[in-house]
Amino acid sequence: LAEVADGSNAFAKVLADAERPMIIVGSGALARDDGAAVLDLARKAAESTGMIAAEWNGFNVLQRAASRVGGLDLGFLPGEGGRDVAGIVAGAGKGEIDLLWLLGADEIDMATLGKAFVVYQGHHGDAGAHRADVILPGAAYTEKDATWVNTEGRVQHGRRAAYPPGDAREDW
């Protein structure tokens, strides 16, 4: 990646000559110990090969959770003394957090939540629903109007295709 970024690798020319080149960095690569360096080198490679321009964004980070990009755009980050997901899960496991509200979230290890009271709001019978003390049935994305930010950072709007079944409600 460093050689692509500095232009010494032949693939750098392939990228520079491409009509719409793109780098998509997975969030798993960023979770590594050297994740910040991977992100920096990928950004440098994108800049040096012309992937970032007014009419084209060829540098993207693929998130594992829906609308994470939108949340980041809005500044939804833990402030001073706040906790990220790992900190919340660890706090629940240690008994420092009594209530955990999962909005369609299942990418955490439910076995580590200790005795925290868990409310699950969502539309799948996933791991979060199986661990929950209370389940609030939610509408799927096809059952509600919604706005989200895609991987490229573009705002998109979806229209409801069907009504939610039973007691399911929109998340708000």
Where are these regions (language model features)?
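Non-catalytic alpha/beta scaffold blocks inside enzyme catalytic domains
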Residues: 1-172
